Design a protein with these regions (language model features):
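Non-catalytic, substrate/partner-engaging modules appended to enzymatic cores
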Residues: 4-376
């Protein structure tokens, strides 16, 4: 009961970069990513030991990117930028809190020379090892939306709580693709040149190409799941050009995002990758938030999906991309700790929530609002 979709069938889906999983009417609100309206705090992966050779700094910064912060700290301490540890990149246009590590013997130089008002050290600790990229659980967000009426604010809250329970597609946000949203084209050209990557900029461009292909694949899977959810078995089978028996099995899955044989899944929020062999069993685990399907970030040394699931992945897999390590990314995530507070007089809605590492607050807001936040 396998599938072998025509290449054309898949390419039709590729026209849709962003497909929303939820079907409610779009909401109206004003979003701006500014230091006054966008707050994010990094949640560390582990508790620091408070002993060891590395100074751990909990830093609040505003109107400053992580790259700029590292440059400022390097200048203040005399360290090379590569010797300053961080877990993830934070945007410039926000008020952010993140953790940084430096060798503790440079603490005196830091105290003496760090003078900018844009950087505030909130806490200090020590650890036996430096912070490395990826060493975070996730991020806690607090965002203020403007020009939202009370009715929409209530519906926003209800929808956000529903998404906390049922989950959302884990698209990369528009920030990943540069100001003109076309950085992935440069990345594709670099990736397919076969040349070794030069510097962090080329790596960033190639990773944008990886992310673009992933978003295309995810949009196709969301569209596919929408067709199954919104049509009877016969209609869905015709629209997808799938065997009716397969669609019947897929339609029995309670969750929105349908799993296929061979889908690469990982225990949520972390664990060892495995492949779907029994759709019913995996569907139950998915419903219980025990596992989540993953999408391909094509590159070197990465596991591909298998069987039916790979037919759906193949159109978004660039086997020429070997200059950057590949990976798999959760396709479906569950926001946590969702809270809202509405200010009637100012028509403002304060939204607080937590997302796992690598997930975008703007993606969550776009799924609720049903419109792009880019260039608002």
């Amino acid at each position: 009961m396998g599938i072998c979709p025509h290449k054309y069938d898949i390419i039709v889906f590729m026209n849709h970069i962003k497909n929303y999983a939820y079907t409610h009417t779009p909401l109206q609100f004003d979003f701006k990513q500014t230091v006054e309206r966008f707050f994010v705090e990094e949640i560390p992966l582990y508790t620091f030991t408070n002993t060891g050779n590395y100074l751990i700094l909990k830093i609040q910064k505003s109107n400053m990117s992580t790259w700029k912060l590292i440059t400022v700290l390097a200048k203040a301490t005399g360290l090379q930028e590569r010797d300053i540890g961080y877990a993830g990149l934070k945007d410039k246009n926000a008020t952010t809190i993140q953790y940084i590590s430096i060798p503790k013997q440079y603490e005196r130089e830091l105290n003496k020379n760090l003078t900018t008002e844009k950087v505030v050290i909130l806490e200090r600790s020590y650890n036996k090892a430096p912070i490395k990229i990826g060493h975070l659980k996730g991020n806690a967000f607090s965002i203020v939306l403007h020009h939202i009426n009370e009715k929409d604010a209530k519906f926003f809250t209800t929808t956000a709580k529903k998404m906390q329970k049922e989950g959302i597609p884990n698209y990369y946000g528009y920030q990943r693709f540069g100001e003109d949203s076309r950085s992935y084209l440069q990345g594709k050209e670099i990736a397919q040149s076969g040349k070794r990557l030069k510097g962090s900029k080329e790596k960033l461009l190639v990773s944008a190409y990886q992310s673009y292909l992933y978003n295309k694949w995810l949009g196709q899977r969301v569209k596919l799941s929408t067709i199954i959810a919104s049509n009877n078995t016969l209609q869905a089978a015709k629209k997808l050009d799938y065997p009716e028996e397969l669609v019947k099995v897929l339609a029995k899955q309670v969750q929105f995002f349908k799993l296929f044989i061979g889908d690469a899944v990982i225990p949520y929020p972390y664990g060892k990758l495995s492949f779907v062999k029994d759709m019913h069993q995996s569907s139950q685990a998915f419903l219980q938030k025990k596992i989540s399907p993953t999408g391909l970030l094509c590159g070197a040394n990465v596991e591909r999906a298998k069987s039916d699931a790979y037919y759906l992945e193949e159109a978004y897999d660039d086997t020429e991309l070997n200059t950057l390590k590949g990976d798999r990314r959760f396709a479906w995530i569950w926001p946590k700790d969702v809270e809202t507070k509405y200010e009637c007089n100012g028509k403002k809605l304060k939204v607080e929530f937590y997302l796992p590492k690598g997930s975008y607050a703007t993606t969550f807001l776009e799924e609720i609002g049903k419109f792009s936040l880019k260039n608002m």
